From Swiss-Prot:
Substrate binds at D90, S91, G92, G93, F94, D144, Q193, G220. Keywords: Glycosyltransferase, Metal-binding, Queuosine biosynthesis, Transferase, tRNA processing, Zinc. Pathway: tRNA modification; tRNA-queuosine biosynthesis. It comes from Methylibium petroleiphilum (strain ATCC BAA-1232 / LMG 22953 / PM1). This is Queuine tRNA-ribosyltransferase.
Length: 375
């Protein structure tokens, strides 16, 4: 089940409401990433309390561990990880792509050695649909080949990008057929590919729209390309997708990227950045980024962000968090992860409120000014 209601627009920016089998998602929204069935260091109840409406799981990693027998026993991912709101699962295409020389791509699928135990595995569009059906994720992603920015040490050529994009389209058709055969009650999204070549992006988009997916994603960005190239594709693709269906920008990105994505018509975002950066002392605030490992914070009594209402900013000083990081105490990355996720989720809440009020452009200008001010 998927229903998308477009509530308001301002330029290309959209305010929407997405209804899925496990609940309603107000868009635009940021989706925390729970690769192995957990958003690292954060309890599900804490995620919900800070405003998370939908989270991610990873098909590839969950297939390897704990495996389908365990997930089938629990009736899917929701009960297994104690999260009763919507879940989106990636198809495994990006993870297979990231294996590099360890994998071999053919028309049929991808052969690779398991990074867990070295077993020889074969992942196909059909297998991906079967795994995601067991996971019972509300949004299922098609199995695709992530077109790299560089191929074998050189920039990916248009010919190489075309071959990759056309393979993903053939896989999309196979995913749609298998998804229907399985009678999966959830929603399958197609993924626009085409590298950094706008005509290929348009060709991919047109072919996927003709297949009539319930929603669409923009893939193959934030894969090593310069920021201006990513922004060019972000400006080209989202608003050309059907207005009455949700749009998802995969794996992006910084707070600035999210606001720019909303400007270009994106509804859904995900990225590991809030939690990964938190574990490395890189924190996001209203007034720019804070590098917690800097010695200047050793005696700083202020919270991470004085305007923030998260648990980490309610009674914990920068000095204390700096101390936890220096000592390798597990409470440190737990608190900083909560802060960064709260910041991203709150940013998107403010975006929605600005769109509701018809003042998104004014919000965007103030956001840029605040972030440029510095901590």
């Amino acid at each position: 089940m998927l229903r998308f209601d477009l509530l308001h627009t301002e330029g290309h920016a959209r305010r929407g409401r997405l209804t899925l089998n496990h609940g309603v998602v107000e868009t635009p929204i940021f989706m925390p990433v729970g690769t192995y069935g957990t958003v690292k260091g954060v309890m599900p109840a804490s995620l919900e309390a800070m405003g998370a409406q939908i989270i991610l799981g990873n098909t590839f990693h969950l297939w390897l561990r704990p495996g389908l027998d365990v997930l089938r026993q629990f009736g899917g991912l929701h009960r297994f990880e104690n999260w009763q709101r919507p879940i989106l699962t990636d198809s495994g295409g990006f993870q297979v792509w990231s294996l590099g020389a360890m994998r071999k791509i053919s028309e049929e699928g991808v052969k690779f050695a398991s990074p867990v135990n070295g077993d020889k595995l074969f992942l196909t569009p059909e297998t991906s649909m079967q795994i995601q059906t067991v996971l019972n994720s509300d949004i299922v992603m098609q199995f695709d080949e992530c077109t790299p920015y560089e191929t074998s040490g050189h920039l990916t050529t248009e010919q190489e990008a075309r071959a990759s994009m056309e393979l993903s389209l053939r896989w999309a058709a196979r995913c749609k057929t298998e998804f229907a055969r399985l009678e999966n009650p959830n929603a399958l999204f197609g993924i626009v590919q085409g590298g950094m070549f706008e005509p290929l992006r348009q060709a991919s988009l047109d072919a996927l729209v003709a297949m009539d997916f319930p929603g669409y994603a923009i893939g193959g960005v934030s894969v090593g390309e310069p920021k201006d190239e990513m922004l060019r594709i972000m400006a080209h693709t989202p608003h050309r997708l059907p207005a009455h269906k949700p749009r998802y920008l995969m794996g992006v990105g910084t707070p600035e990227d999210l606001v720019e994505g909303v400007t270009q018509g994106v509804d859904l975002f995900d990225c590991v950045m809030p939690t990964r950066n938190a574990r490395n002392g890189h924190l996001f605030t209203r007034h720019g980024d804070l590098r917690l490992r800097n010695a200047r914070y050793k005696t700083d009594e202020r919270p991470i962000d004085e305007s923030c209402t998260c648990t980490a900013c309610n009674g914990f000083s920068r000095a204390y968090l700096h101390h936890l990081d220096r000592c390798g105490e597990m409470l440190g990355p737990m608190l900083t992860s909560i802060h960064n996720l709260h910041y991203f989720l709150n940013l998107m809440r403010e975006v929605r409120e600005a769109l509701d009020a018809g003042r998104f452009e004014a919000f965007r200008a103030q956001f840029r000014a605040d972030r440029a001010r510095g901590v």
